[in-house]
Amino acid sequence: MNGILPLYKPTGMTSADAVYHARKILGIKKIGHSGTLDPNVDGVLPLAIGAGTKAVPQLMASGKVYTGEITLGFATTTEDLDGEVVDKTPLTQPFTADQLDAALTAWTGNITQIPPMFSAVKVNGRRLYEYARAGETVKRPERQATVSQFTRTDEPVFSATDGTQRFRFEVHVSKGTYIRTLAVDVGKTLGVAAVMSQLTRVKSGGFTLKQAVSIEQLKAHAAAGTLADVIQPIDIAFADLPQVDLTVEQFEAISHGRFLSLDQQTPRVRLHFAGVLKAIYRREDDQYRPDLMFLANEKNV
């Protein structure tokens, strides 16, 4: 079995746990995910199955869309609600909608982020969260990210009792963007402490939340023998590349790793034979050469 499974990961489950459950249900060991979701974040987690694992870099390179909530007035060690409160800046009056929108706009475009201490980024061979759990702080490398859209999606709610204000948002980002840090940065722009108080990934790898399948639904499909209904073909990860349908002779040629002369000009193409993705070829010196091979890929039934 080969393909891409858009899985719904609930809150409280790690991405590794989601992979474990999928392996157990499908009886397949070769399964990987295309971008970690923190335990307290729910949403779309595309899983690559079998030969589909070769498509993970392509899936990870795609942009992601999140919806969530930012709360102004306090900060935590983890930049979300899981951490300990380390700063309080009680609001005596609410920010206007225009002020909030301007702060979001300020973090739209090409931005620079410093990864949070509670993250999986490695520094000197150790994960940042390992330093954080040991009570250590290290210098973290800056990372570039792109925020193509960052908008408020509801009316802000102010609590005079708590000195907080919260509002929901939708954000479209490039891979590797830390939404927790984005929430904190919005607070800095407004001059107050802030946390990400809720987050859902609604699009990843080209898959939307509506397409995502829960663990329970996956079990039901496995029992009914209808897994082909939810496991998408590998080529969906390369849908932006031109498709070339191979002749028998051309398929024989790529089966032996040979180059092809094609009536194409794009940097990469996806090669199909008998309706199934068999290879990704890249253009070099007026010929197309092997990039990724999927010769054993067949239709899931």
Swiss-Prot record:
What are the GO MF terms of this UniProt record?
RNA binding; tRNA pseudouridine(55) synthase activity
What is this protein's record name? tRNA pseudouridine synthase B
Provide the family line.
Belongs to the pseudouridine synthase TruB family. Type 1 subfamily.
EC number(s) per entry:
5.4.99.25
Which reaction does this enzyme catalyse, per its entry? uridine(55) in tRNA = pseudouridine(55) in tRNA
Q: Which NCBIfam families match?
A: TruB
Name the InterPro entries on file: PsdUridine_synth_cat_dom_sf (IPR020103), PsdUridine_synth_N (IPR002501), tRNA_psdUridine_synth_TruB (IPR014780), TruB_C (IPR032819)
Known role: Responsible for synthesis of pseudouridine from uracil-55 in the psi GC loop of transfer RNAs.
Gene designation: truB
One Gene Ontology term from the biological process aspect of the record? tRNA pseudouridine synthesis
Which CDD domains does the entry link to? Answer: PseudoU_synth_EcTruB
